[in-house]
Amino acid sequence: MLPSQTPAQGSGRFLLLSPPSLSSHPEKLNAILGLHARESTDLQMLDRLALGLVSLPQSTYDVVLLLTGADNTLAETYRLVSRGVLQGVVNSLKPGGKLRNRDNQIWGSGSDSAAGLGSSDGGGGGGGGEKKSSSEQAFRNEAILAGLVFDDRGELAKPDFGAQQAVPLKLGRKKNLGDSAFGNGTVELPASNGVRVTAGATTTTPTTTTTTTINSSTPSGVRFIDFSDDFGVPMVEETQELDEELIDEEELLGEFDMGRPIVQPPECRPKAGKRRRACKDCTCGLSQKLEAEDRAKRANADKALETLKLGTNDLAEVDFTVQGKVGSCGNCALGDAFRCDGCPYIGLPAFKPGEEVRLLNNDVQL
């Protein structure tokens, strides 16, 4: 019997996922739809799900069936069911819903002879003695990662976590002193000269153990630490501050040390054609030397800029005496209609290229 001729098993709401190749064979698709009740069965195309054109409702279906393609294999189905599509299919299943890889057949039943995608294992989806195809095994792994589990029948099912109930933890009541961890309220200690220690008095008896009665006001399970027993050494208060003498590191250096030249390491010495950068924690003087050079260069640059500054009474002359010499845009001599926005000749009449034009204190002289 072909997979499309397998009768439907169980009841509930079904979702049929069809590969696009099956739509070109309407007789096969209609035969599959005829095996299920139309009012409780939905049909979706896998390629539309993969492209995100349609979405599946949440927690709606009891059984999702992956239909075989036109060649009666699951090769096309496995190729279209990506991780995102499979996660959407799992979300559309109700708790306890089933995912079956053929037309209402459980995992491991039937065969895919055309593509070699799986073989009968006799025991369902848990894996049998015969070798499964890599595509089917990869699909099973993705299904498990998506949240499905194999039930006792070998079917991929969505676990029902709603049946679980929270169990409160009841803490026991306070035990009486007689039922505490100390038993009858005494602790057996090694004997010391046959002395039994009790709550009221100390008596000498020929016993070999010492019994100490626990104070009845002490809660069960509470231990006390005696900090006073330090073998005669007094305890130091935490608030007591130790006097620490601060040492100025500059006082450790004398005049001879301050006048001693700094020995520059060989790796820090400048090399020809390359300026070495100073270390972050430089102590050889290279950092100070480079900073001094930078300051000198900066001062020289500022001094050079000062000499180039022009005052308001200085003459700013643009010489066009060279025949054919024009501005960078080439339109300065053509008039305002052809001049740039920041052209110094805006407002001036057109002049011939080569004509001397002088701007002197905002007075135009041609």
Curated annotation (Swiss-Prot):
It comes from the Eukaryota. Residues 100-136 are annotated as: Disordered. Residues 119-128 have a biased composition (Gly residues). Signal peptide: none annotated. [4Fe-4S] cluster binds at residues 329, 332, 340, 343. It is found in: Cytoplasm; Mitochondrion intermembrane space. Residues 329-343 are annotated as: Fe-S binding site B. Transmembrane segments: none annotated. Residues 8-167 are annotated as: N-terminal SAM-like domain. It holds the Pfam family CIAPIN1. Residues 168-258 are annotated as: Linker. Gene3D superfamilies: Fe-S cluster assembly protein Dre2, N-terminal domain (3.40.50.11000). GO terms for molecular function: 2 iron, 2 sulfur cluster binding; 4 iron, 4 sulfur cluster binding; electron transfer activity; metal ion binding. Residues 268-284 are annotated as: Fe-S binding site A. Residues 108-118 have a biased composition (Low complexity). Its main location: cytoplasm. [2Fe-2S] cluster binds at residues 268, 279, 282, 284. GO terms for cellular component: mitochondrial intermembrane space. Keywords: 2Fe-2S, 4Fe-4S, Cytoplasm, Iron, Iron-sulfur, Metal-binding, Mitochondrion. Component of the cytosolic iron-sulfur (Fe-S) protein assembly (CIA) machinery required for the maturation of extramitochondrial Fe-S proteins. Part of an electron transfer chain functioning in an early step of cytosolic Fe-S biogenesis, facilitating the de novo assembly of a [4Fe-4S] cluster on the scaffold complex CFD1-NBP35. Electrons are transferred to DRE2 from NADPH via the FAD- and FMN-containing protein TAH18. Belongs to the anamorsin family. Monomer. Interacts with TAH18. Interacts with MIA40. The C-terminal domain binds 2 Fe-S clusters but is otherwise mostly in an intrinsically disordered conformation. This is Fe-S cluster assembly protein DRE2. It comes from Paracoccidioides lutzii (strain ATCC MYA-826 / Pb01). The lineage of its organism: Eukaryota, Fungi, Dikarya, Ascomycota, Pezizomycotina.
